[in-house]
Amino acid sequence: MDSIWKKRKQQLQDFRRYLNKDNKVKKQEVPDGLYQACPNCNSTIRTLDLKNHLQVCPQCGHHLFIDAYARLDALFDHGKYKEYYTSMKSGNPLGFPGYEEKLEKYEYKTGLHDGVVVAGGRIDHMRTIVVVMDHRFMMASMGSVAGEKITHAIEMATRKKLPLIVFTSSGGARMQEGIFSLMQMGKTCAALKRHLDAGLLYISYLTHPTTGGVTASFAMLGDINIAEPEALVGFAGPRVIESTMKTKLPVGFQRAEFLEDHGFVDMIVKREKMRDTLALLLRMHA
């Protein structure tokens, strides 16, 4: 009897300790990169959901940045393609202070040697050469390597009698390379003229942001110019223009919709329709 009483007493003490215990749920840290905030509507979105929607916000439709390889995976049949000119790396032709260290930093950070990726594959069974500018690497500014890779891609498309698609996204010419950067404008345009003379299709696909010397050269020379929604496309930035001209710019100035209204862009295509639209255009011009 005494042992039963002691056992009962122990159980009551254990129960009281449990009641007095701090039962508050401890705050858990959310792993980095699990969620992202949409810069347009501030919705919190799972990173995996963004990836499945090609980096387009499922709440408001805002187009976030998508890297070159994710775009190529979504564009080519079964995500299969061959990448070209992977060994090209920028030098420092003008001996610009700190430039080599900056290049090394971006190579380590992105895994890229420059901000241009060239690939060949099939879109709806049609062979196509595709160039994608990836602004993770120094805003995909156009230096000698970027211009050389784009020129090589154009010349390969001309030689193989293939259509060419270029996805632009750039801060313009690379100041660290001076005149070597600026000459890429003429070089790429000359290569495009030879592609045009061969009777081949060139589609320029403008993404956010496309500015500077890229806009002033190959970006606006497409047989068909397509843009993603709300992409900024221009030469100088809006703030530079306003401060220089001492005037207020129209609402939406330099955005894709403004350019379409004024005849500089042929169509605006949402990213989810990118592959189907390009496949249709390639089929029409085959």
Region spans (language model):
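N-terminal alpha-helical interaction blocks
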Residues: 1-26
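Residues immediately within or flanking Cys/His clusters that coordinate Zn2+
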Residues: 35, 54
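Cys/His-rich microdomains that often coordinate metals
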Residues: 44-45, 63-64
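Cleft-lining beta-strand/loop regions that shape enzyme active-site pockets
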Residues: 117-196, 203
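Conserved catalytic cores of soluble enzyme domains
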Residues: 171-286
